[in-house]
């Protein structure tokens, strides 16, 4: 996984890739982040490339210190930092979207309860339209980040041979529609993968 209790820093690790309150705990987010990582990033990247991303997370450049344009950083460090940032952005947004209801409720032996502040402060419930807009925004940001991730890896395939040898890449390479860009060339969809990968309901 590319989030951890060790690097959580009172939610600052998550806040670096999306707008959240710094009081958010790793304990609350660990399962949603792990689920989204396994459900979306692992199938997209393949096991070898996921291993590379996790290694970059654990031992590579610190994105809080290393910006992509930092002088003195090697080209590979800049690429690794960018790759990790895109992966984390996709992972975080998809975790909130995928587990939206579970995150906003408590499940106990007494049943299901709405989350309330532990320190006694009161928070007004969001309106239904705000909740719907938030869900759509999280979904779009997450899937757009996955598109950005694929474009990044296609552009830097020589630097990341783990992705080039993955079954996921081989399947996409032989597909009729390989990417959002292929669809965008024929019919403008504004780069939204949700349009060309959505399943009929």
Show where each model-derived region lies:
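Low-complexity intrinsically disordered segments
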Residues: 1-24, 148-194
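N-terminal interaction modules that seed assembly of large macromolecular complexes
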Residues: 11-72
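Short, mixed-charge amphipathic alpha-helical segments
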Residues: 59-63, 71-89
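Elongated alpha-helical scaffolds
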Residues: 82-109
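Conserved binding-pocket/active-site segment within a compact domain
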Residues: 108-169
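Residue-level detector of conserved catalytic or cofactor/ligand-binding positions
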Residues: 193-201
